[in-house]
Amino acid sequence: MNPIILIIILMTVMLGTIIVMISTHWLLIWIGFEMNMLAIIPIMMKKHNPRATEASTKYFLTQSTASMLLMMAIIINLMFSGQWTVMKLFNPMASMLMTMALAMKLGMAPFHFWVPEVTQGIPLSSGLILLTWQKLAPMSVLYQILPSINLDLILTLSILSITIGGWGGLNQTQLRKIMAYSSIAHMGWMTAVLLYNPTMTLLNLIIYIIMTSTMFTLFMANSTTTTLSLSHTWNKAPIMTILVLITLLSMGGLPPLSGFMPKWMIIQEMTKNDSIILPTLMAITALLNLYFYMRLTYSTALTMFPSTNNMKMKWQFPTTKRMTLLPTMTVLSTMLLPLTPILSILE
């Protein structure tokens, strides 16, 4: 793709998200979502192959359905309140439709079906945008309609997402699908605490974006998309492999890494609000995620897959790809846990 065209498309994606985040009018929010969706489809189809085309079509269909639901919720709200301003939704039906439309855009269960398929069909760089930047707009709208969200509905969606995000990733060997299921689980954690402490949701979102960006950058640097190709990176770049493994464990929420901090704070927040069974269930289900990350780490670090002698010589050659931000991102995605006492002011 022509670099100028790519820059224009990326700017449109960013503009769409920014319009959604700063608007106080429902129609502008809807327009922002549409701009964002139509601009990201060419980015997904950068590589002209049938898989990318299929993934883009799936993405387009699900996002269009979510946009229609969103517009329907906006119109129902308009009928009851008589205004377009973004504020408390007066009608429970409008609130439910809006929550479901945003859950569909975020890829939360039971509307998660498109996330693994789409992420698997597109290049790593497009997958990075899909699983990080694309979460900002729907999350900001959820944040704005907080007072009118149905607690039972949002907690059901979050528990389903955490469970499916854990179970779905168990039998995967494709790294992009593992990242997609991880994204579903993380969305579940974020929305679970949304009504108790929205600032905690933002903290979780920031840490999730940092960890996912680091992960995808490392995958792009090593050109790895499967467990097998990840196991061969020992021969190509031993230090890079160690970084991949530590970041993977951080994504699984293993203490004392960064990924443990949001989980710890969310469980603490929910316990403070006299919710005991729910955080217990969430913590148990999070072990599924940790299990498939541990298994990936084990298969890469402690088992030797068959490889040729030529492959074993690759460590001698310097890496040609420049990754300026990688050291900073790796530190942020693994070493933020000591900052937890400072962040306790978020409460």
Swiss-Prot record:
The chain crosses the membrane at residues 3-23, 25-45, 67-87, 96-116, 122-142, 145-165, 178-198, 200-220, 237-257, 274-294, 325-345. GO terms for cellular component: mitochondrial inner membrane; respiratory chain complex I. It catalyses: a ubiquinone + NADH + 5 H(+)(in) = a ubiquinol + NAD(+) + 4 H(+)(out). Its main location: mitochondrion. Keywords: Electron transport, Membrane, Mitochondrion, Mitochondrion inner membrane, NAD, Respiratory chain, Translocase, Transmembrane, Transmembrane helix, Transport, Ubiquinone. Its EC number is 7.1.1.2. It is a multi-pass membrane protein. InterPro entries: Complex_I_Subunit_2, NADH_DH_su2_C, NADH_UbQ_OxRdtase_chain2, ND/Mrp_TM. It is an enzyme of class 7 (translocase). It is found in: Mitochondrion inner membrane. One of its GO terms (biological process) is reactive oxygen species metabolic process. One of its GO terms (molecular function) is NADH dehydrogenase (ubiquinone) activity. Core subunit of the mitochondrial membrane respiratory chain NADH dehydrogenase (Complex I) which catalyzes electron transfer from NADH through the respiratory chain, using ubiquinone as an electron acceptor. Essential for the catalytic activity and assembly of complex I. Core subunit of respiratory chain NADH dehydrogenase (Complex I) which is composed of 45 different subunits. Interacts with TMEM242. Belongs to the complex I subunit 2 family. PANTHER family: NADH-UBIQUINONE OXIDOREDUCTASE CHAIN 2 (PTHR46552:SF1). This is NADH-ubiquinone oxidoreductase chain 2. It comes from Ovis aries (Sheep). The lineage of its organism: Eukaryota, Metazoa, Chordata, Craniata, Vertebrata. The gene is MT-ND2.
